[in-house]
Swiss-Prot record:
It comes from Medicago sativa (Alfalfa). The lineage of its organism: Eukaryota, Viridiplantae, Streptophyta, Embryophyta, Tracheophyta. Pathway: Secondary metabolite biosynthesis; flavonoid biosynthesis. One of its GO terms (molecular function) is naringenin-chalcone synthase activity. Keywords: Acyltransferase, Flavonoid biosynthesis, Transferase. This is Chalcone synthase 2. The gene is CHS2.
Length: 389
């Protein structure tokens, strides 16, 4: 008779969870940051608020963002005036948009990831879907299963309303699933659409205005599995260790609330300070077992919450400016796409590493870190190992 421990051992994979493919997608509507303040104040009927517009222009200029992609076009916004008004009841209109657009954009990214992976989609055993954009039942995971034509018995996990740290959360969950289910192939999809957070400006709530200057739409998809099939599956990064922690004394630093007016975000001014204050402890916990204490010797994938966070982290750890190149490039080209951002940065890094003729997918280095920051203030840490190119 077979023992439970033997059954458990047979169910586990041999090697670490590995990212086997990455795909990304954005809406067709591209918004140039330099002209966005004019568009934003015009479409929200706020052109008379000249001082506020000047403040918003400065926010956009300092954002280090060149362009963003948005589902919301001028035409859609004109048809939905309540979405443009500050705190006007508009949840129904917003929900009607995102319950369709989140799975649609997610599908676009997933199709690219599945194509790169090179295996039939029938081999996908698990599906993780994450979005901060709206809620529905059955969820975006169900809709995506239908849109992609996945098997009806694929094991689904739906994460709603997590926020910007969740790119790390999906990797942590995918790692556990891949390593504890032999032969598992996990499709991970983060799809974010700002239709839930867009609203007109307010003189009294400048933190809301910060979000209007930073957030963009995007979806990213990964295939994760252990023990890659030789000659068929091509590993990109290995996931070695993960952690999640709530930063001490950070309650209310970042929070979001789904209300009649949509999803409202609140940020304390000291969010960059809280992140930089807690990052050393997270790094020590992650890299001390590997004997690594020089954080310039690893590659970096950090959620680009905004330029101030990146600047303070660089300063705190005395990082060389090039360490955040991939992160800053994604921020510049796409803005803050919440949970999808770090997955875009993984894609950017492996592509640039190949283009530049480097030895590994991690800018020529072996070890790296992925950080997610978001509501709580919650910090997700993932230790990555690159793969030889």
């Amino acid at each position: 008779m077979v023992s439970v421990s033997e059954i458990r051992k047979a169910q586990r994979a041999e090697g670490p969870a590995t990212i086997l493919a990455i795909g990304t997608a954005n809406p067709a509507n591209c918004v140039e940051q330099s002209t966005y303040p004019d568009f934003y104040f015009k479409i929200t009927n706020s052109e008379h608020k000249t001082e506020l517009k000047e403040k918003f222009q400065r926010m956009c200029d300092k954002s280090m963002i060149k362009r963003r992609y948005m589902y919301l076009t001028e035409e859609i916004l004109k048809e939905n005036p309540n979405v443009c008004e500050y705190m006007a009841p508009s949840l129904d209109a917003r929900q009607d948009m995102v319950v369709v657009e989140v799975p649609r954009l997610g599908k676009e990214a997933a199709v690219k990831a599945i194509k790169e992976w090179g295996q039939p989609k029938s081999k996908i055993t698990h599906l993780i879907v994450c979005t901060t954009s709206g809620v529905d039942m059955p969820g975006a995971d169900y809709q995506l299963t239908k849109l992609l034509g996945l098997r009806p018995y694929v094991k689904r996990y739906m994460m709603y309303q997590q926020g910007c740290f969740a790119g790390g959360t999906v990797l942590r969950l995918a790692k556990d699933l891949a390593e504890n289910n032999k032969g598992a192939r996990v499709l991970v999809v983060c799809s974010e659409v700002t239709a839930v957070t867009f609203r007109g400006p307010s003189d009294t709530h400048l933190d809301s205005l910060v979000g209007q200057a930073l957030f963009g739409d995007g979806a990213a998809a990964l295939i994760v599995g252990s023990d890659p099939v030789p000659e068929i599956e091509k590993p990109i990064f290995e996931m070695v260790w993960t952690a999640q922690t709530i930063a001490p004394d950070s309650e209310g630093a970042i929070d979001g609330h789904l209300r009649e007016a949509g999803l409202t975000f609140h940020l304390l001014k000291d969010v960059p300070g809280i992140v930089s204050k807690n990052i050393t402890k997270a790094l020590v916990e992650a890299f001390e077992p590997l004997g690594i204490s020089d954080y310039n010797s690893i590659f970096w994938i950090a959620h680009p919450g905004g330029p101030a966070i990146l600047d303070q982290v660089e300063q705190k750890l005395a990082l060389k400016p090039e360490k955040m190149n991939a992160t800053r490039e994604v921020l510049s080209e796409y803005g803050n796409m919440s949970s999808a951002c770090v997955l875009f940065i993984l894609d950017e890094m492996r592509k640039k590493s190949t283009q530049n003729g480097l030895k590994t997918t991690g800018e020529g280095l072996e070890w790296g870190v992925l950080f997610g920051f978001g509501p709580g203030l919650t910090i997700e840490t993932v230790v990555l190992r690159s793969v030889a190119i």
